[in-house]
């Protein structure tokens, strides 16, 4: 039996729409992510689901992304002249769906890594990553890697998608704390993408290029202040903030409390605030818990970048 944990991820990081993503884990050691357990059975295939957010999963197993991951893995294995072993997959759904924390990516990545390990790793990391992107595309409507790549590989990943590479790890600031606040409401990725304009002004395109280039340069040259200043979003945030509760007011308040940057995690509704130290992170956590959460489903976690990514757990 294998148990594979895939951590939450925060895509875009304000400045890198569809090109940046970070794997995130709470500093208290709790698991903010999905777990897939895989074990041998005598014949066939079985899928079971458990966990706090299991009630949010599709009722029909064929619509479950873990089932689709199993089917895709089986198809790819057959192309290599091999068959999938009889097995049972159990998804422990610990992540809210439509949260902006890479919930679908967690399930996809954990399932494919579990299947690959269970079959003695017939596929390379790059081949698995391509499968992950394909499955993510089925949910959001377009193939993108800014959740699956950091979730799988850990750290902050920059999507290059050239010269045979899907992504490359970006040096980052280990002393930064990420305060993640999920308000307890759902925003579908497809809905959040549909709200974006089909074209942008030249001014916004130039600003976006300047911010992204400046951010990547600052990461490589260890300039924290410059990196934080460059974390501006002219592509998605101006259009998506209407989907989030009191976003403009909350963003300003977090800045007043000492946040280096605040933005939308993925397509929302989770937001992130970057804190330079633990004391500021605790202040931000307290404020967001009081002013951003909308119901009992919501939560706030003080986190750091998870450099390990998807891994086997006991």
From Swiss-Prot:
Protein localization: Cytoplasm
E.C. numbers: 2.7.1.39
Matching PROSITE patterns: GHMP_KINASES_ATP (PS00627)
Pathway: Amino-acid biosynthesis; L-threonine biosynthesis; L-threonine from L-aspartate: step 4/5
Signal peptide interval: none
Principal localisation: cytoplasm
Gene Ontology biological process terms, A to Z: threonine biosynthetic process
Binding-site positions, ATP: 96-106
Protein name in UniProt: Homoserine kinase
Organism of origin: Haemophilus influenzae (strain 86-028NP)
């Amino acid at each position: 039996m294998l148990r594979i944990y895939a951590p939450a991820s925060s895509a875009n990081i304000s400045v890198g729409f569809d090109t940046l993503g970070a794997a995130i884990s709470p500093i208290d050691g709790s698991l903010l992510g999905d777990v897939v357990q895989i074990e041998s059975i005598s014949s066939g295939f079985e899928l079971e689901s458990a966990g706090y957010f299991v009630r949010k999963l599709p009722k029909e197993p064929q619509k479950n992304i873990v089932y689709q991951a199993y089917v895709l893995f089986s198809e790819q294995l057959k192309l290599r002249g091999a068959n999938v072993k009889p097995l049972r997959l159990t998804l422990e759904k610990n992540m809210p769906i439509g949260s902006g924390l890479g919930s679908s990516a967690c399930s996809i990545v954990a399932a494919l890594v579990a299947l690959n390990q269970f079959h003695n790793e017939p596929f390379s990391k790059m081949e698995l990553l391509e499968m992950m992107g394909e499955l993510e595309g089925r949910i959001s409507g377009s193939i993108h890697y800014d959740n699956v790549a950091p979730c799988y590989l850990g750290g902050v990943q920059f999507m290059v998608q050239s010269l045979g590479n899907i992504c490359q790890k970006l040096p980052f600031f280990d002393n930064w704390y990420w305060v993640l606040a999920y308000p307890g409401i759902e925003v579908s990725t497809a809905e959040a993408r549909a709200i974006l304009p089909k074209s942008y002004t030249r001014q916004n395109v130039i600003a976006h290029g300047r911010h992204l280039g400046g951010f990547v340069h600052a990461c490589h040259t260890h300039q924290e202040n410059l990196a934080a200043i460059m974390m501006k979003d002219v592509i998605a945030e101006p259009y998506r903030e209407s989907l989030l509760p009191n976003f403009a007011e909350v963003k300003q308040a977090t800045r007043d409390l000492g946040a280096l940057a605040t933005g939308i995690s993925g397509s929302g509704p989770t937001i992130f605030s970057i804190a330079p130290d633990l004391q500021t992170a605790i202040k931000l956590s307290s404020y967001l818990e009081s002013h951003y959460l909308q119901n009992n489903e919501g939560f706030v976690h003080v986190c750091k970048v998870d450099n390990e990514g998807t891994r086997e757990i006991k």
